[in-house]
Amino acid sequence: MGMLKIGKNCSVCKEWQEHCYWSHMADDCKHFLTYMVGDFTESMIVPSRFANNFNGHISEVVNLKSPSGKTWSIGVAYSDTGELVLRSGWKEFVDANGVQENDCLLFRYSGVSSFDVLIFDPSGCEKASPHFVENRGFGREEKSAGAEGGGRDGDKNGHHQHQLEMTPHKNSSRCRSIPSACKRGLFSDEIEQDHREEKKEGDDEDEDEDEDEDVDKDGEDRYYFCRHGGRVTEYNLSKGDKEEISRVPVPVEPGNPVLVKVIHASHLLSSRYSTVGVSPEFAGRYLGPAMAREVVMERGGGGGGGDQWHVRFVRRESSRGFHGTGWRRFARDNGLLAHDVCLFELRLVDGAGAGDRLRRRPRPTMAVHVLRRVRGRFVLIR
């Protein structure tokens, strides 16, 4: 009732509202709007009030996700006047999405220096063409799987089917109506899959089963590097990559073991069968059979006081890994991209030494640090 009596022009009230908006509302509720005028094709200035209030939350690279679901990594710089500017990669985003003069772009912050972008024409109507930009990131993986899989057309088609199922779901609030025949083709398999999830949940795991997996343990940093064989060699890390990753200043607690994992495009799909494989050595040493079937994940660098995601950890005869809705939410909320490198730091209780499998937290807790290759080098995404 008190709020209703406050005058519309009360400066104290406005300051209080500003404070609540920027300091207490969820970040994914925050937006900014900008018009494409002047020389907009080479760079774009982020509104200063938005940039100032997000100081420290926007890294040297941001991810822009168009309505099609495709994501661009854009380099960030500061102008001579201190303005935050999107530069490297911005022109490619503009060209691919057909952004023209006097168009209006609405940016919604989606976490981890990431934005969902809607594009409107000068009349104020959303443009249709950005919804249909080819997602070459997923296409590259499908082509690789088909080329190196050797007679796995069924797998390839299945992967493509999951992609078709994902796209309308994620953009359902903006898509036009789909003809009934198309709906049957897109969603009929998903209905049938609901009844056989437990039977086939391992069919779409990534390719780090025992026979295709190698683990390199860095004795000093206790990094466990996974190598993916077979059809997913594009996600392998070279020796130079591993050395560079080991040099990145990641806030890992001394003595905590770290699983280093490259994220596949398939890990980011809405398929309920996708599993992020964990190496047998790491799982056997630190996530043994006596451990709970749930892992708590937190973003690294937060000191354990931030958001948490409860992720299912599954074990099967020849594989083990993170699986299910909890993992998909973690990947979505943190803006993970294919080829990101996740460092899963298992937090041990104080005083637990190397190989001490009894002195873990009651429920396994992992701080996840994310590295991304930007202009040829790995950087820590905060």
UniProtKB/Swiss-Prot annotation:
InterPro entries: B3_DNA-bd, DNA-bd_pseudobarrel_sf, REM16-like
UniProt KW keywords: DNA-binding, Nucleus, Repeat, Transcription, Transcription regulation
Region feature Disordered, mapped onto this chain: 136-222
GO CC list: nucleus
A molecular function (GO) term: DNA binding
SMART domains given in the database record: B3
DNA-binding region: 29-123, 261-363
Predominant location category: nucleus
Subcellular location: Nucleus
UniProt entry tagged with the keyword Metal-binding: no
Annotated Basic and acidic residues bias: 136-158, 193-202
Composition skew (Acidic residues), residue ranges: 203-218
Protein name listed in UniProt: B3 domain-containing protein Os03g0622100
